[in-house]
Every structure is written in C-alpha cells, then in structure tokens.
C-alpha cells in the first residue's frame, strides 16, 4: 500500500508543480491546467506504463507472493494514473491554490512565494546553482559518471547470488534466535537427503553398495565439517547390528564382507525394529537414503556442497555401474530443494529485469522517434542499477530473492523522471531549436518536481526499514539509494548527454514547412 502510494503520488507532484509554475507566471486557473496537461499528460502516461512494465515483469518470478506483489502494484499504478488525470483537475477546480481572478493571482503570487512557497523557493534556488554544471561542463560531468560507473562495475564482479533463509531475518528476532540455538545445541536446523537407488531388488544388501555409501558419508563429514553435524543411513544400522550380534566388540563395528551375513544382520534388525528400518530403506532394499543434519548456511554454499557430493558419488559408484546399470545417487530433501529454488527464483528475477529493460528501451525509442534520444534516456537509468549492485559488491551484501527485486522495480520507476525531463526538453527544443535554452527551461519547469518525486519515492521505500525481515530492509534502503542516484543522473548526466550527443528535435517551423510541402 505504501509502495503504491509513493509511486502514485509522483505524477500528482509533476502536475501540481507544473500547475504552480504556470500560475506563478501569471496564467489563469484554466490556462495553467491546459498548459500543464499539454506538457505533462503524455509524460505521465508513459511513466505509468514504464512503472507498470517494471512491476508486471515480476510475474516472471515463479513464486506467488512476488507475482501478487507485481500484479497488484501494477494495477495500483494504473488506477493512480486514472485518478491523477481525471480526479485531480476536478479537485483543483474545487480547491485552487490561487484566487480565480488573474490580477488577484498575480498579487497573491509574490506573497505565496515569500511565505507558503518558501520551501519551493529553497529547492529552486539550489537547482539554479547546480543547473549551469550540465551545460557549462558537459564533458567533465559525463566523464565523472563514466568513471563512477567503471568503479561500480568492478564492485558488481564481487556480487554473488546467495539466499540465506535465516540471515534474511533481523538479529534479535525470536525466529532467528531459535534457529541459532538449534544450530548450536540441537544438531542443526536443516537437513538434506541423499538417495541411493540401485535399480535392483536387494541391491542394498550388497556390501559393496554399503561400503560406497559409507565412503560417501565420510566424504560429506570431512569435506563440510562446519555444515554437517551428523549423517545416518542403512550403513549405521548394519554396523550397529553387526556389533551387537558380536557381543559389542568395537572391532565388529564394520559392514560384513559376506553378503549372506549382511543379509542376516539386516533381517535381525528388521525383526527388532521394522519402523526404523523403513525410515532408511524400502521394503525391497532397492532404494536407501542417507539423512544428513546441517547447520544453517546460504544457498550458494549448499549448492556447492550438492555439486561436490554428486561428483564424488559419480566417481565412487562408477565401479558398480556394470552390476547396477540403473544405479543413481542424488541429493534431495527440503533444504536441497529450497536452496535450488531460491537460486532459480533469483535467476528468474534477473530475466525479469532483462525483460523490463528491453521493453522500456523499445518504448523510449518508439516515443522519442530517435535512436539517439532513446539511448540518452536509457543510460542514466542504468546508472542507479550499477550503483546498487556495485555497492552491494563492495559491502559483500549478497543478492537474494528480496534485493533482486530492486533492479526491475528501480528501472521501471526511475525512468519516470527521465521521461518527464525529456518530454519537456523535446517541447522546448522543438519550439526554439536551442539545446542550452531547452535545458535551462526544462530544469526550471521540471527540476523541482523531479527532486520532490525522488524524495517521496525514497521515503516511501525507506518504510521497509521498519520490517523485521532483513531482506525487505535491504530492499528498501537499496531502492532509496537507487532513486537518489537516479535523481543525480537526471539532473546532471542527462542534460550533459543531451548537449554532447546533440539531441535535438525538429522545430515547429520545420514541421510546418514539411506539412505544407
């Protein structure tokens, strides 16, 4: 709700800011409304579309809560756009910030700017001081952003996709405390199952199979001592039973080499405790399990463990393939599936970001009818994504299922201010044909609205800091950083690139001449 509120209010800020701008320049209420909608209506529609694309791209993530988040956020943005376009003008008719008498408006205008408009004047004064940077030193500004992008790109190489289901809960929360206690004193909070399928009846009565399983258990324990606390299988049952049948001699804690003795040992155990036997092996002894108790860790380490277990099993059981051609060893269980699922979800979110980027790029190229303008519009919005991922790399913050939400949402929302800037810039350059003049006028008409919308969005996303979920807190602060850097890119990089790449549009006079021809 807070997210949709923060996003939805952005268009309202642009329209109100534009309305006040035109009223401050002496236009009547009706004229100001016409002027602001003439300049911002298309931009508001495009920004709503790009934001919806960013939200709806989350439907590619195969997890219901994230899909619901993307779906209803996109619908909320659409409803907010309709209310802004149709309800806001009616509200301004009923409650106009200025008197309807133009003369009274002009008289009151100065008083309002001095008193009630002090905050707006303060922002405008700051913008007036920074606006010359973009058109006086466009190359220096652009190179500064390029240098920052290179530094951040190196940080991105340090980023790893890793979801830790315990660490996403903040320290001090009861659930995290419970997990930590279980890890320390109760043998581990997680588990994995290694299934050994011989493909033959009584396959697990073969001493060679059990010896291979024993070696696998030893490998798991020795290779991952910080993770594995205990492993149990039919191997332990056969060793314990054989030792018990031999007067408890420690030297008899082994797997019998003779298949007949092993079969008899397992038969005796099954008679004594059939329920426990069924936990470890099927009734026909073709399929068995190795149950591994694990401490908490991240999905990357678990996936590495699973990969190495499979490699060792392939090598160790290879000599038995001739007698057991259908022999298969695989890691499964809740933790293994959850670990692989989180990585699958993470890569799905990477794909959703890619889709959002492609669709938004095509939309920008289509709207501005210029490859150059489309690229100039897109590049400042890639910078915030570089920033958050670069910072995460340097701070060793892993990309998980929560922080990966930042990329598609950020590019969908951050591009909004770029569209507002370029739409206004196109109108000014088309009218006057002067790029510098177009930048100055655009800065003064849209700079304040861009600043306020970025602040509103940042505050809206920082609300996630209150969550007990560490992943959502990271998502909130990274999103706020992204919107702040997007603001810097829109105020400095975008106008500088417009100058450097000579982004201009046909003047209205030229269009008129073409129409006459």
Q: What is each PLM-predicted segment?
A:
Residues 1-15, 373-422, 462, 492-493, ...:
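Hydrophobic transmembrane alpha-helices and their membrane-interface caps
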Residues 5-7, 13-27, 35, 56-60, ...:
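Helix-loop junctions at the membrane interface of multi-pass solute transporters
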Residues 19, 37, 41, 49, ...:
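Hydrophobic residues within alpha-helical transmembrane segments
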Residues 22-49, 429-452:
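Helix-loop junctions and hydrophobic alpha-helical segments within the transmembrane domains
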Residues 30-37, 120-133, 334-341, 436, ...:
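Cytosolic juxtamembrane amphipathic/interface segments immediately preceding
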Residues 34, 82-149, 430, 495-517:
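Interfacial helix-loop-helix hairpins and adjacent transmembrane helices
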Residues 45-88, 361-365, 387-398, 447-505:
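Hydrophobic, glycine/alanine-rich multi-pass transmembrane helices and their short helix-loop junctions
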Residues 137-401, 499, 503-517:
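Extracytoplasmic
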């Amino acid at each position: 709700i807070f997210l949709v509120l923060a996003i939805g209010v952005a268009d309202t800020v642009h329209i109100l800011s534009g309305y006040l701008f035109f009223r401050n320049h002496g236009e009547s209420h009706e004229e100001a409304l016409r002027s602001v909608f003439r300049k911002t209506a298309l931009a508001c529609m495009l920004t709503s579309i790009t934001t919806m694309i960013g939200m709806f791209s989350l439907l590619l993530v195969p997890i219901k809560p994230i899909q619901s988040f993307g779906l209803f956020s996109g619908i909320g943005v659409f409803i907010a756009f309709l209310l802004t376009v149709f309800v806001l003008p009616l509200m301004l008719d009923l409650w106009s910030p200025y008197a309807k008498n133009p003369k009274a408006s002009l008289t009151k205008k100065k008083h309002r700017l001095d008193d009630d408009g002090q905050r707006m004047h303060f922002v405008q004064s700051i913008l007036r001081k920074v606006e010359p940077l973009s058109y006086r030193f466009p190359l220096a500004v652009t190179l500064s952003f390029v240098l920052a992008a290179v530094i951040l790109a190196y940080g991105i190489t340090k980023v790893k996709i890793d979801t830790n289901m315990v660490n996403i809960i903040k320290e001090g929360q009861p659930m995290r405390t419970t997990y930590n206690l279980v890890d320390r004193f109760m043998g581990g909070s997680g588990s994995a199952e290694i299934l050994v399928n011989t493909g033959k009846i009584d396959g697990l009565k073969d001493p060679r199979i059990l010896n291979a399983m024993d070696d696998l258990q030893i490998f798991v324990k020795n290779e991952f001592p910080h993770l594995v606390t205990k492993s149990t299988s039919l191997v332990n049952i056969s060793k314990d039973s054989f030792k018990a049948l031999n007067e408890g001699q420690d030297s008899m804690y082994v797997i019998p080499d003779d298949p007949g003795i092993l079969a008899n040992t397992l038969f005796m155990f099954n008679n004594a405790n059939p329920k426990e036997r069924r936990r470890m092996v099927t009734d026909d002894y073709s399929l068995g399990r190795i149950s591994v108790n694990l401490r908490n860790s991240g999905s990357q380490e678990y996936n590495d463990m699973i990969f190495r277990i499979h490699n060792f099993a392939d090598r160790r059981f290879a000599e038995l393939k001739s007698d057991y051609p259908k022999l298969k060893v695989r890691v499964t269980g809740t933790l293994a599936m959850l670990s692989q699922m989180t990585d699958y979800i993470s890569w799905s979110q990477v794909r959703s970001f890619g889709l959002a980027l492609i669709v938004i790029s095509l939309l920008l190229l289509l709207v501005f009818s210029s490859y150059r303008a489309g690229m100039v519009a897109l590049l400042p919005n890639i910078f915030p994504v570089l920033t958050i991922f670069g910072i995460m790399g340097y701070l060793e913050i892993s990309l998980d299922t929560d922080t990966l939400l930042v990329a598609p949402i950020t590019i969908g929302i951050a591009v909004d201010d770029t569209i507002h800037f370029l739409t206004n810039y196109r109108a000014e350059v088309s009218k006057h044909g002067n790029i510098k003049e177009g930048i100055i006028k655009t800065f003064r008409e849209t700079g304040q609205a861009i600043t306020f919308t970025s602040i509103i969005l940042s505050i809206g996303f920082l609300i996630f800091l209150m969550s007990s979920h560490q992943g959502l807190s990271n998502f909130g602060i990274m999103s706020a950083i992204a919107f702040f850097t997007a603001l810097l890119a829109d105020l400095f990089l975008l106008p500088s690139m417009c100058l450097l790449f000579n982004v201009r549009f046909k003047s209205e006079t030229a269009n008129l001449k073409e129409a006459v021809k």
